[in-house]
Amino acid sequence: MKILKSLVLLVLFIVMPAKAHDAFSWMSTSFSGLKGLFGCLEVPEFTSFQESNIGINLSKAGAWQSTGHTVEKGKLLKINWSIAGVTTEPRKYLVLYRIDPRFSTPQVFIKTYNYSKLQFEALGFPRFVTNSNSSIPGAIPPDKDLDALSFTKMSDSIKYFNYSKNNVKIEVKAGDVVNISLVGKDNFFTSNTLDNILTEELDSSIFAPSALYTQSNLGNFDNRIIYASAKEVCDIIDAARDPDKPSGCSGTGAATKYKSINSNEALVGKPMMIGAIHNFMGLINSCPEHSGINTRPACYYDQGRGMIIKVGGQVIKERDQSFVKSGRNSFIYYQATRDGIMNFTSDWQVSNMFNNSVLMSDWIRRFLNYPSFIDYINQNDWSANFLYFGRYSMIVEIGNGANSISADVQQNISLEYLITYDGTLPDPSIRGTPVDYNFAADAPKDGYLWLRVVNPNSNIQGVVSVNYANYTGTTWFSDIVYNGAIKPITDQFRTFSKNFYIKLIKNSAVQNIVKAALTLYVIIFGLMFVAGALKLTAIEVITRICKIAIVAFLIREESWNFFNTYFFSVFTDGINFFITNVVGATSSRSNIFGFIDPIFDKYTNGRIWGLLFIELLQIHNGLAFIAIITIYSLITYFRAILEVIIGYVIAFIGITVMISLAPFFIILMLFEKTKSLFDNWISTLLSYVVQPTILLIFFLLIDQVLSEQLLKVVVRACWDTLIPIKIGLDLTNLGIPINFSFTLPFLPGIPFYVPDVPEISRSNIFTNNANTFLVLFTTSLLFYSYCLMSYGLVTFVNIVVGMLTNVTPARISGNYQARSDPVGAVMQDIGSVTTPMKNASMVPARVFKDKIIDQNYKARKSEGGVEFTNKFFSERNDITKKEEGARE
């Protein structure tokens, strides 16, 4: 107390130094300044685990992401992750739809967007093989003739447009949402294309009828289709058929023909020079809605008209249907109802455009060499009966947020973790440790935790959700209990069981017993079969053969390895397997008793016991009684934890002992009269596995309730006056009318932490608000009840396991009703050993209760007096009644 007062005064002097003119103002100083200094002690939250989550966007796949957490070597690290937020990226395609009379169907150039490379790519496009000096893949070497080269590539061109090469088809799944938009030609010929394929128009100043082209010479009048007779075209560009005007028109009426000027470019879908086509497009208008071919006067089709789009054979856009126009955008929005390939086609035919065959597929069959092909092109008249040309540039986007990603794609996504000694961002080339969806292991070293997603798929998007937690509490208790005590015992009994088993099967007497039992079994079986007393079925024969094989294998040298691998390990490892999987929160995966560490972290928390000690000092309002109940309940609960540990050890020892005796019981399964002993042996092994598992399940359920109740029993405490000091003088009993009391401003009482509990009043005595006396009292009783439940779990679980496995515990000698409880017997022995220490620790408590609380003193008997006890300050205890009467 002197030290406490000195400390308080020292703090006051430091906070408020005295000055000469202060006089006695220090007497008016209170302890309110200390309140802000010491503050309040809050009820702690049980945070043995550091938990958090992170969302890793697939756009950052391959890069390490910081969690901001540090982990400790040998302590639990849990990582759970989900790909529920991952969806397929919208599949993007650039499509160039072009009319070319050399192909029976429209040309369709397709470029696919590769998300991993962030580029478009024209897969399977029949490009030229270039020399090593060319900087542009697919470029034509300057010393080669375009037409001669392309003649040998005609078959590749046909295969490309028939999807028989490696070019990608646009696949659509049922439920996919398809969006097709018209775009400018620059969008298709984007420079962001792999290997620079189709980044520019396919064109040449030299006419090559066997080469591929992309232009239609529409210039600024792109995304349009022309289908008109030669007469309608010529009536616009040269109605008079002026021979001095080189228009390419000849003939009149139905005999009108049109031929490209200075070349035969109409063969490749370029019927006019750029200037001429611009002039022609300026003279015609857009065709009316739902107009067919050969509309008079000539007109052009736009907004996708003239093109049919199908998915799996189902038409999603009719030929005469226009794209929806919104501002500058023209698009079609469609949700697929079936699986299939998207196809761009038209029912307008190109056949009969010329009098001679212009199909590239016919040229391949007819001409075996280039000179004969050139002669055919140069010697024929390529005047067109009608003109059908033009193109559309489109971007196709296909997505489906409702459909989940495929199983193959899911398997390709992986998560890795990495632990580094410092917080420096690791290099992406550093490999991490892969984890499954529910990963739990001990951290291999101390350091900072990093996570990353490895995603080899280029067509998915979204966020991978990762929840991670690591244990941050102490592990001293489980290290002592498991590594220091239990593991040596279990390892020793494992070795004992193995050695005893091996010695047993090598014993000549045991081997003779096995051989005799097998011989007797076969003889009895044969006699019963001969006598007709045995009705054999296929199952009966297989069962008897298996029994003979198992017992015969028992006396072989590899008997232990066989039975331990395929049978005994089910029980020896099964008990650890069940306990490990039942436990949720644990400090270490390698320590099966790691679940005790979080429990001890909760119930040995220094703040909890500090607040309980503060409540112990509240004798005047009954909080001390609540604290005593809580402390006693915790001690009872700790004893229950000890029972769980002892129950596990006894169960494991029982399993190893039963396994060591396995040869005797396995022999007994041969005969029906002894088979019940074998069955009981199996039931006993099973009961030893089930008992600690069920016990732990009940124990953990009670622990969850206890954690909540404990936080309600312990209350917040703030720095305040613990014991008020009041000086008073009352002389009224002497006839002097003086009666006053006062407190010292500088020392109103003994300061300390005081529980933040409202005083009892009529308004709150029966309320159930938090921290009222009624709530604290009822909660402490509930806490005590739950602790008593945990204390009686062993007996209850023994009864439950006995009902399940039909294995009844032995009875106590002389008491048929009482069952033997090995755990209870061990606890009773521990109690006997600790009784002297318990009694010694209770002596100060009894003295405190007797002398201070009850104020009950016993004095030595005076000479001639009688020893008696009475209340302190009420009567003297060291004199007799006779002496007291004499004084009066």
UniProtKB/Swiss-Prot annotation:
One of its GO terms (biological process) is protein secretion by the type IV secretion system. It is a multi-pass membrane protein. Keywords: Cell membrane, Membrane, Signal, Transmembrane, Transmembrane helix. It is found in: Cell membrane. Its main location: membrane. Residues 1-20 form the signal peptide. InterPro entries: Conjugal_tfr_TrbL/VirB6 (IPR007688). It comes from the Bacteria. One of its GO terms (cellular component) is plasma membrane. The chain crosses the membrane at residues 513-533, 565-585, 611-631, 649-669, 682-702, 781-801. Belongs to the TrbL/VirB6 family. This is Uncharacterized protein RP107.
